[in-house]
Amino acid sequence: MAGPQSFTPPSVTPSRTKKRFTLAEANKSLPYVSRIVKDLVTINRTIATQQQKIEKKAGKDRGSSEKELVISKDRLQSLVEELSAVGAELKDPRSGLIDFIGRHKGHDVCLCWRLGEEKVSFFHEMESGVAGRQPVTGLDESD
């Protein structure tokens, strides 16, 4: 049997009117952001496990488990909102992948960070996603 699947909170699709970060600002926010993301990844795993347990239970035996699941989903949603309030965008709740909106050669890009990385080391074009990650050594923040 495969491991727990992830739960995708409804608000992971960001609006593009978020705060813009310089690379330095994004890195400065990481101590706080990483704590949020660590909790988010953990609660996401918990939700996946809870969902699997509920699927295996019959009718009335599901009651308390479903209540626990609702509480966990509410906690996850509040963590997503907390992350969003900072200006970071959740991309993958399983790996803790997030983006900050930054600038490169006069246009918006995503400064890309994943839980466990010491600093923001990559960026990518808005539509290319993580597959298009490039080292920040090539980032030109001037307009």
PLM regions and their residue ranges:
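Long, hydrophobic N-terminal alpha-helical segment
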Residues: 1-57
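A structural signal for alpha-helical segments
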Residues: 21, 28, 64-67, 71
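Heptad-repeat coiled-coil alpha-helices
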Residues: 49, 53-56, 60-63, 85, ...
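Short amphipathic alpha-helical coiled-coil/interface segments
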Residues: 68-83
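Glycine-rich, aromatic-bearing surface loops/beta-hairpins
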Residues: 85, 89-143
